[in-house]
Curated annotation (Swiss-Prot):
Record field: catalytic activity: tRNA(Ile) + L-isoleucine + ATP = L-isoleucyl-tRNA(Ile) + AMP + diphosphate
Protein family according to the UniProt entry: Belongs to the class-I aminoacyl-tRNA synthetase family. IleS type 1 subfamily.
Oligomer status and interactors: Monomer.
Name of the gene: ileS
Lineage: Bacteria, Pseudomonadati, Pseudomonadota, Alphaproteobacteria, Hyphomicrobiales
Pfam families named among the record's database cross-references: Anticodon_1, tRNA-synt_1
Organism, scientific name: Brucella abortus (strain 2308)
CC annotations in GO: cytosol
Keyword Nucleotide-binding part of the UniProt annotation: yes
Locus of motif 'KMSKS' region: 644-648
Binding site for ATP: 647
Protein's name according to its UniProt entry: Isoleucine--tRNA ligase
Keyword Protein biosynthesis among record annotations: yes
Membrane spanning stretches: none
Motif 'HIGH' region, residue numbers: 63-73
InterPro entries membership: aa-tRNA-synth_I_CS, aa-tRNA-synth_Ia, Anticodon_Ile_BEm, Ile-tRNA-ligase, Ile-tRNA-ligase_type1, Ile-tRNA_ligase, M/V/L/I-tRNA-synth_anticd-bd, Rossmann-like_a/b/a_fold
Length: 972
């Protein structure tokens, strides 16, 4: 080589080389992977690969087949996907069968909207034609949502999903109902249910949401019946109740009190209003509430005496509407009720068993005693399904001049019922006071209109009937809850409290699109128990679907020879929660690729009252235990300020928009870094935070790929590895334990945080930074370089597989860049970690080394900031260490290499005044000094041996030796 030959030293370095782009381009690149996975049928390949492994089953809670997916769907499906992928990569056959909930009111509502727009009347359309349109509507949205889920990288058996409208599913749902009928758990009763006048159907609690409304409130006088109270001064007095539903007064049958409350008899002394109580009237109130009530009515009063609970229990009252419309001539008993408080009102509760759950329960608890007292215990039906009063509300129903009054009209608007009832109470001199109140009130989640409680004939499942083995459905469900794992644990308490307090399960809906309550009954509501009839029903549903129940001639077809016996065919359909609660039967039990019970159910926290709840009841009622071993819940997604997302507020974030602008892996990273079991926040700034975190992660992966381009797969024996490499392998053992534990406990945030911190803090800012010199500049034969490549290789394989369930697109891209002949990273397993890699003693030593290093780097940062050095390689600091355990930790190490300086001196002398220190590292001080020698043109390190090799006068002896080796290999 001549003196005139100029070497381009950058071409002699092992610099990173990769086609893995720095800019991810996820919106454009991700669909290519979706297409690749589809073309290779990745899901099927994984099933074949894992066919001999133990099954792990997450049973998919079915989303509703109506509309595009929203951010809640994305959160839910991503969490499920991470679970199934992580178990697949840890040695399980982790199947995922997606499902859809297809029946129910929302779809009916959409078809009815279409009819209304076309001027068609739904009632004039044959029911099976209507059901056909509902089925087609659901099918279309299943196709749309399938593609949207695939775009999120959800991996599942989308070619063979389950749907609740599949003929086999409908047959199985019907079969589950017939099991309840056969065991005597199903009964026809009447009960106040939440009723949507607009939709003409009963609603489950899960279908109701609460909004503030302003209502009439009234205080009403119930006179003490004279013939009962002649022996004391309660004769001629009245008990006062308070209600925010004046329209329920015609349904009143009792007044409830509490034996825990102190009551008094009060006399009115002055009255300002022209209507209402007059001076001299005597009224009974709770002592705590009389002043507030009388102030509302502008009355002055005096207390006459106490009234005991025993006394209240003996009297009966006259109905305030007594005689109106020729009705209300019955007496109104006083009932002791646990639900009565003196927090508000009068201390007495107007009890209308037709219009309230607690009212109903209080009435039924006392039914036998009431009947013994000559009081009719039957519960009336004062309001019809159309919101009009019936004949059971004399004077307000069909007998009323001008027609019956109405509680709510077809548009969900308040009718005239409150007005006419209040007017009649005034006319009867039974109104104590009136006012307006803003309060929370139930509304249909679909129509957004108020609902009412009304007594209706419905089909129920008993919660407390003895099932023949000493258990009840409630006791079975509570036992199952205790045997189930909940994440978070608070979910167990929440579901338990709901089961403990819930009433009998209402199964019926008065709609068209659903699985029918396929039973026949006599006039008393007794169910026909006939195996041959049931078999004909099940066989027909299996072949034709539940439409068979509504076809012409269905009654005769199914009853066969018993058609002449007078059995009535029930036309109600099942609540959709019974549908979804039965999915475990036709998926987990019936599919050979699944198993019963499921390992886990995962849904939003609202499903404690929804799918978790109905699945638990259905399975406990028919199989005696829950259909799941674990229940995982997530919260709801709010905007970045913690407000509920709403189109009207313009603060919604759609998964489609995030994917289009940033990519699905960004959305998945957001899910993985949230406390998903709580309510999460999402908005532009939060998305940007995740984009920034993703870029750092991607650049770390990219650097490893570029570095590994020079990896020839050589391995250095563990015993020969430098300490720094052994430290990194030790960290992999710790992370391996954390990752596996995190996936087991569904603690994804812990995994994501740990891996991101490892990549940013321990790799990019520590290990990679230190080893760049060896990786780029060392000779091909260097053990140090080979050891570093081997370690980067081990880190890459583990990081990418650990992250693959979370970021499937990016990790697939990185894996195929490194291993282009591979099927997919998702066909890989988490690598086992050799036990010898664990070295806690070494880790403790390096904790001390890194503490000293932090003081050095802190001192050099100040030097850089003050422009005294440009690079740490220009420095050769002096480190003063007073703590012997810290100085001992540096023995045998090239501490200059670790600090990325060209030299370093360690002294046990006292540090000079002004030396740099860190408060949290005691006994260490640093005095920065410039490095001696010349700058190597190849490595940029300052050494005193630059030019030692005359053939390479610009470089250090180390670099000259590397160049000679490259030259010998023909690479220079």
């Amino acid at each position: 080589m001549t003196d005139t030959t100029k070497i381009d030293y950058s071409k002699t370095l092992y610099l990173p080389q990769t086609e893995f782009p720095m800019r991810a381009g996820l919106p454009q690149r991700e669909p290519l992977f979706v297409q690749r996975w589809e073309e290779m049928n990745l899901y099927k390949k994984l099933r074949e690969q894992a066919k001999d492994r133990p099954l792990y089953v997450l049973h998919d809670g079915p989303p509703y087949a109506n509309g595009n997916i929203h951010i809640g769907h994305a959160l839910n499906k991503i969490l499920k996907d991470v679970i199934t992928r992580s178990f697949q990569m840890r040695g399980y056959n982790s199947n995922y069968v997606p499902g859809w909930d297809c029946h129910g009111l929302p779809i009916e509502w959409k078809i009815e909207e279409k009819y209304r727009a076309a001027g068609k009347n739904k009632d004039e359309v044959p029911i099976n034609e209507f059901r056909k349109e509902c089925r087609e509507f659901a099918s279309n949205w299943i196709k749309v949502q399938t593609e949207e889920f695939k775009r999120l990288a959800i991996l599942g058996d989308f070619e063979n999903p389950y749907t609740t409208m599949n003929f086999h599913a409908e047959a199985r749902i019907a079969g589950e109902l017939l099991k309840f009928a056969a065991s005597g758990q199903l009964y026809r009763g009447s009960k106040p249910v939440m009723w949507s006048v607009v939709e003409r159907t009963a609603l489950a609690e899960a279908e109701v949401e609460y909004h503030d409304i302003e209502s009439d409130m009234i205080w009403v006088k119930f006179p003490v019946a004279g013939e009962v109270a002649t022996e004391n001064d309660l004769s001629g007095s009245a008990v006062v109740i308070w209600t925010t539903t004046p329209w329920t007064i015609p349904g009143n049958r009792a007044v409830s009190y509490s034996s825990r409350i102190e009551y008094g008899l009060f006399e009115i002394t002055e009255a300002e209003n022209d209507f209402g109580p007059r001076p001299g009237e005597r009224l009974v109130f709770a002592d705590k509430l009389v002043e507030e009530c009388c102030a509302k009515a502008k009355l002055q009063f005096k207390r006459l005496r106490s009234v005991s609970a025993e006394e209240l229990g003996k009297i009966v009252l006259d109905h305030p509407l007594k005689g109106f419309g020729g009705g209300y001539e019955f007496v109104v008993p006083m009932l002791d009720g646990d639900h009565v408080t003196d927090d508000a009102g009068t201390g007495f509760v107007h009890t209308a068993p037709s219009h309230g759950r607690e009212d109903f329960e209080a009435w039924m608890d006392n039914a036998r005693q009431l009947e013994a007292r000559g009081i009719d215990p039957n519960i009336p039906f004062p309001v019809g399904d159309d919101g009009f009063y019936t004949k059971d509300a004399p004077g307000f129903g069909p007998d009323r001049e001008g027609g019956p009054a109405r509680v709510i009209d077809d548009n969900g608007k308040k009718g005239d019922a409150n007005k006419v009832v209040i007017e009649q109470l005034i006319a009867a001199d039974k109104l104590f006071a009136r006012g307006r109140l803003k309060h929370s009130y139930p509304h249909s989640w679909r129509s957004k209109k108020p609902v009412i409680f009304r007594n209706t004939p419905q089909w129920f499942v008993y919660m407390d009937k003895n099932l023949g083995d000493g258990t009840t459905l409630r006791s079975r469900a509570l036992k199952a809850i205790d045997e189930t794992r909940f994440v978070p644990a608070a979910g167990q308490t929440r579901l338990r409290s709901m089961i403990e307090g819930r009433p009998d399960w209402v199964l019926s809906r008065q709609r068209a699109w659903g699985v029918p309550i396929c039973v026949f009954v006599d006039e008393e509501g007794n169910i026909l128990q006939d195996d041959a009839v049931n078999k004909r029903i099940m066989d027909a549903f299996e072949k034709e679907g539940a439409d068979a129940w509504f076809a012409d001639g269905a009654r005769e077809r199914f009853l066969g020879a018993r058609a002449g016996e007078g059995w009535t065919q029930v036309r109600d359909i099942l609540d959709v929660w019974f549908d979804s609660g039965s999915t475990h039967t036709f998926t987990l039990e019936d599919r050979p690729d699944l198993k019963w019970p499921a390992d886990v159910y995962l849904e939003g926290s609202d499903q404690h009252r929804g799918w978790f709840h109905s699945s638990l009841l259905e399975s406990c009622g028919t199989r005696g235990r829950a259909p799941y071993n674990a229940v995982v819940t997530h919260g709801f997604t709010m905007d970045e300020h913690g407000k509920k997302m709403s189109k009207s507020l313009g603060n919604t974030v759609t998964p489609q928009d995030v994917i289009k602008e940033s990519g699905a892996d960004i959305l998945r990273l957001w899910v993985m870094t949230t406390d998903y079991w709580e309510d999460q926040r999402l908005g532009k700034s939060i998305i940007q935070t995740n984009i920034d975190a993703y870029r750092k992660l991607r650049n770390t992966i990219r650097w490893m790929l570029g570095t590994l381009a020079h990896d020839e797969g050589e391995n250095v024996a563990y015993a020969d590895l430098p300490e720094l490499e052994r430290l990194m392998l030790h960290r992999l053992t710790e992370l391996d334990e954390l990752v596996r534990s995190g996936y087991d406990t569904f603690d994804f945030k812990r995994i994501a945080r740990a891996l991101v911190d490892f990549m940013n803090v321990e790799l990019s800012a520590f290990y990679f930074d230190i080893r760049k010199d060896a990786l780029y500049c060392d000779a091909p034969s260097s053990i140090r370089r080979k050891a570093a490549l081997q370690t980067v290789r081990e880190i890459f394989v583990r990081l990418t597989t650990w992250l693959a369930p979370m970021l499937p697109f990016t990790m697939e891209e990185a894996w195929l860049d490194r291993y282009p002949q591979s099927v997919s990273i998702h066909a890989e397993q988490f690598r086992p970690t050799p036990a010898e890699w664990r070295d806690d003693v070494l880790a403790e030593k390096w904790r001390k080394v890194r503490a000293v290093r932090r003081v050095v780097t802190g001192a050099l940062e100040l030097e850089r900031a003050d422009k005294r050095i440009g690079s740490s390689l220009e420095a050769a600091p002096v480190v003063y260490i007073a703590d012997k355990s810290l100085s001992d930790s540096l023995e045998g190490l090239d501490f200059a290499e670790i600090c990325i300086t060209s030299g370093i001196s360690v002294s046990d002398a006292a540090a000079p005044e002004g030396a740099f220190t860190l408060g949290d590292v005691k006994g260490v001080a640093v005095v920065p000094e410039r490095a001696k020698g010349e700058k190597c043109a190849r490595s940029w390190r300052y050494t005193t041996d630059v030019g030692a090799d005359p053939e390479f006068p610009e470089v250090s002896a180390r670099d000259a030796a590397a160049l000679r080796e490259l030259q010998a290999l023909g690479k220079l």
